[in-house]
Amino acid sequence: MKYYIIAGEASGDMHASNLVAEIKKKDKKAEFRGCGGDLMKAQGVDLLKHYRTMAYMGFVEVAVNLRKVLDSIAQCKKDIVDYQPDVVILVDYPGFNFRIADFAHEKGFKVFYYISPQVWAWKRRRVRKIQKSVDKMLVILPFEEEFYKRYGVDVTYVGHPLLDELAKFGNGNRSMFLRRNSLGEKREIIALLPGSRKQEVKRMLPVMLKVTSHFPEYQFVVAGVSSLEKSLYKGIMGKADVFLVENQTYELLQNSSAALVTSGTATLETALFSVPEVVCYKATGFSYHLAKWMIKVKFISLVNLIMDKEVVKELIQGDLTEDNLVKELNQLLHDGNRQRQMLEDYEDLQDRLGNAGASEKAASVIIESLKLKK
């Protein structure tokens, strides 16, 4: 069968590539085309566009680059019609993928959505559009299945694909990691995860770097991603006493005592590595106020949303200050009770998420559903 798959950012590329790998095991004649990143390409997906040319963060950035976004959508629509896939698989990335879902449905293509947009947090009216244009939702958070069922959407909870990644990762060698990155053996590490998009890094990393001088006994290490130029990080870091590692986020977390993490998938990754964290988020003023007006949930981090309580501290917008970061990081490093409670909550979080196997289950659901509908 022919599969058209679209992911618009780094985490989506990772999850989509794992899904492709599992589909190939079950469908030996599978062919793939779509939009995504290096990991999808490595699995044999013929890319129309790389997500680097598509990823914009927040209302303002999207508005400024609206022409580019609309051009990408138009190119993608044409490519789907030319390719004539058996199914269109959309991975998160709602601003782009909702438009593709509507189009693909109208043209008679089967549409599967893997990794739900956070419509339960805002824009709940979008659920009605999902009900009309998506044949099957494959969700990765425990509470999402019940949410969609309330609206009559065909939905299956497949588990969280991050558990698949962690199962593959295993235990790294600390000494090798330290030597490879010229890190000291004696000083504990604090990880800085500023995000995977250029706009995020430019906004978040300068704020995170302000805390480094308050903790001279620790070594701060920035998690760089392959989709961004090394010069971007180096330009922001300047002469600060901070290290940069590239494409080694899991090894970094495995060897860290605490982390400052930009809100997103990385907050859950950090928790699954049992690293105490502070969640950070800052948008442009307009984007933030618009989001605040629209958002319907109490928390922004996946950890707190899944647990339905504040497990990790969220420093958002005006609260994301040097003083607050120093205060929270101090507690994570030196308050034993705070550390123990957070780690206990992390264990409960893992219990709620269940076991690995999301990619395999999602692939099975897709292939079986297509067989039934043929």
Regions found by a protein language model. Give the residues of each.
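Nucleotide-activated sugar donor-binding and catalytic core shared by glycosyltransferases
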Residues: M1-K374
